[in-house]
Each structure stands twice: as structure tokens, then as C-alpha cells.
Amino acid sequence: MKNADVAIIGGGIVGLATGWQITQRFPQTSVLILEKENELALHQTGHNSGVLHSGIYYKPGSLRAINCREGIKAMKAFCTAEEIPWDECGKVIVAVDESEFGALDNIFERGQQNGVVCEMIDEARLKEYEPHVAGIRGIHVPETGIVDYRQVAVRLGERIQEKGHLIQTGAEVVGIKHHADGITLQTRAGDFTAKQVINCGGLFSDRVARLGGAHPDSKIVPFRGEYYELKPEAEHLCKSLIYPVPNPEFPFLGVHFTRMIHGGVECGPNAVWAFAREGYTKSNINLRDLLEAATYPGFLKMACKYWKTGLGEMWRSFSKPAFVEALQRLIPEIRSEHLVAAPAGVRAQALGPDGSLVDDFLIDESDRMINVLNAPSPAATSSLRIGQSIVDLLAPRIQ
């Protein structure tokens, strides 16, 4: 049995950033990271669109706003120091008709309150940034950028291991036992003990928390985001990042265009309920995941509230013409033949028992465990700052 001062469950970017922050602040503290897959960062981190978010959308004073603002600076600094490619390409949020002006104004006001560098621009200025866009007004956010978050995560893992700490892959946690002087984590790679445990289990964070004896009110419901990529001959239609004005009643940003750090342009995502927590395709069905979500009172209440929006998202999932139509609101020149299917991602969204989508980061503490129960976008951008916040919670326990 292997021992550590702190064990982290989950080898995605939040877990790895947390481990790295522990090694920076408490170099004498031994760290163990347990990852159920055979490689790091294969799920939410590995399917991330790679945007360095500015924090313009989030409620002032929220954990998302605070951590994103500080996190983007930390992420850019880390990538620069580690010579990981990133690009401050900028972003435009586009209103295509006057009915969207009110929501656009609200986003701009939030951006200013959060300290985001942003500018309201007219149609002529919009065309300077994105000549093919259809908007009549927009917000330009120059500090938004792009990066490969899996590359960042892998580098964090390398730095942790260089300091002599263990990253154990193939170690799905199947049991958690508390005892007087710590916690035993039973995994498919053997048993491990730790004085403190941090749960960064992503799509399975609520189940891990319950294994550890916690009773979170929320439950993870997986939403698949499906993408297309522009063929090379159409990539000139998008110079940076192009976003619509999002529906303020729905917690997703709408289909948009993202220029990628390694080349190419992604289009999407939609947001559809996935029938498995790792349901990257329509045919991925896990009966436990499906029944657990479908019988959860919070899910049923959410479905009643958002059924119309949900049907629209589902229609875009099954109908490429409907997906193309949504993209054409931003760039009318887009045609179906410009698009090829790209890998999907799955977002772990915490859902409350009242049907509310938890719209902020959610971190819960118990006796010897810290559970990250909700870490949606912009968690990757914010990961180094989230890790710092977790270490702040951990510090009194290990000093």
C-alpha cells in the first residue's frame, strides 16, 4: 500500500493544477494523483475547445468571475514560462439584430464590472475584425485567447513528477474508507492511503463524493457538445473567435466559431443531454447513467423548464442543416459542404434538486476530503487559480 500526505482523485487539468500548486506552496508535502484512464486529461480537458476565457459573461463577485480573471493571467504566464504555444487572438460577441442589444449591453456591463478589457463596436468596426460576420453591433474582447489545455495538463503532470510525486494511471477509485489517521482509497491499481483527499473527479465527482461519505445536494448531468470543423478552403471566413449573444435563460453560449491553436476552425457546440457520462457519441448509452439522471427530480424539473430549448438543441444534433442554419446567423457564407464532423465533448453540469443548473464553481469540504462538485467552463482557464483556492482550504489541514 502506498502512502501520501495528499491524494488527488482525477488527472484532468483541475486536479493537476491543484497538485502543482501544492508542490509550489508546500514542497515537503507528498502528493499522489490517481487517474482512472491510462493517460492524463482524456475527458473534459482533452475535449476542450481551448479558449482562454476573459470572464466577461460571469456574475460579478462569483467564483467563476474571480477565478477566471485571475486564472487567465496565471495560465498565460505559465504557458509563456513553459514555452507552450498560446495566442491572444481576441473574440467578438455578435448581435445580429436589434432584439439582442439589451442582452449584449448586459454582457458588456458585466465585463466592465469584472475588469475585462472590452469595447462595444459598431458594424463597421465589427467588419474590420471579422469581414464575413453578419452582425450589426458587437463586443470586442482582445484578451481572449486560445491554447491546448491537454498540453498544459500534461506539462503540469511532468512538473509534479519531476519533484518526486506519484501519478498513478489506471487507478479508478472504487471504494473510500475513513480511519483514525487518514483515508484508504481502493482502486483498480491497488490501495493507497492519504491524510487528505481532494476529489477532482469531473464527470464522476458527485459519485466520488458519495463514496467518501458526503451527501451533495446536486447531481452531475452530462451534456454532450457536438462540433464541426471548417474545411481548409473555408477557414478564411473566421479570423479569431466569433460568438453569438447567448440566451440569458440557458447556461450555454450557443454555437460559435473557434480558431484552434494548432490550426483549423471549430464550429459549435450544441448542448444535448448525453445518455452516458462519457457519452461522446449518440450511440453511447450507459443504463446506470441514463436511469440515474432520468429519475432524478432535479432533472425532471429542468426538462420541464427548458424543454423547448432542449428540443432545439436535439434537433441540431440530428440535423446538419439545422446546425448550419445556426452558424449562418453569424456567417451567412457558411455552407453544409464547408463542414466536416469533429470530435464531441461532454460537460459535467451539476444540477440542483429544484431543477436549477448550478451556475458557479462549487467546492465542498468534509472531514478529510475536499470535493470539487461543479467546475464547468471556464474551469480550464481558471484551473491554476482554482488549484490555489483549494490549497488555501487545504493549508490549515496540513500545516
Spans of model-derived segments:
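Dinucleotide-binding Rossmann-like beta1-alpha1 core, especially the glycine-rich loop
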Residues: 50-125, 135, 254-255, 276, ...
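Short beta-strand to alpha-helix junction loop
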Residues: 59-70, 94-104, 139-159, 168, ...
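Helix-loop-beta segment of a Rossmann-like dinucleotide-binding subdomain
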Residues: 85-95, 107, 120, 127-164, ...
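Flavin-dependent oxidoreductases
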Residues: 17, 176-286
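Glycine-rich FAD pyrophosphate-binding loop
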Residues: 23-46
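Beta1/beta-strand and adjacent pyrophosphate-binding region of the FAD-binding site
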Residues: 1-14, 32
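Helical element adjacent to the flavin cofactor pocket in flavoenzyme catalytic cores
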Residues: 139-196, 200, 204-207, 382-395
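C-terminal catalytic lobe of FAD-dependent flavoproteins
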Residues: 282, 294-297, 302-399
